[in-house]
Amino acid sequence: MRKITVLSMITLDGVMQAPGGPEEDLSGGFEYGGWSAPFNDEESGKVMQKLMQPSDLLLGRRTFKIWEDYWPKHTNYWPSINTVTKYVLSTTTTKSDWENTVFVNGIEAIRQIKNSDGSDLQVWGSSEVIQLLLKNDLIDELWLFIHPLTLGKGKKLFVGGAIPASFTLKESVVTPKGLIMANFSRAGDVKTGTSGG
């Protein structure tokens, strides 16, 4: 069985929309595209390089379209990006010239991929895919890149529908610019109790 890891850049108020650039995702009138750029530094770059090791990818259609134009020309930064399998959840797009791309449709297809043999899966961006995974308890790990700002609007990582779940902090890094990079692993059901005394 493959592990599914979600990697998401988020703000303090949970916004994950268009961290990479002004034109990345303008849906809903979003005007803060590129909000993560001021927080990039050497420390965050080291963590990102570690995470860009060969691993198959599970992407939504919008993220895939952005990546399809960009990453094949930037393999110096992510050498394995062309050779790993890119599973794309889409009901409208069904073909691509980008090598090793497989289009899938629906949660059952994702379950089959997760239960098959192969490398672990990473989910970058892809807010709709993440919501589907959260609702169906298919996320094994979260890598959250928590940026010290609020935006007030935009697509959020947790919008409702996630099942109650516990996570354990496995690793964390805080950069000089205040970016918190935290790796959480699924740890069973939510436990409750009484605080204090």
Q: Where in this protein do the model-derived segments appear?
A:
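Portal/gating segments that form or line small-molecule/metal binding sites
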Residues: M1-L138, P148-G197
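Short, conserved catalytic or interaction motifs in soluble domains
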Residues: E141
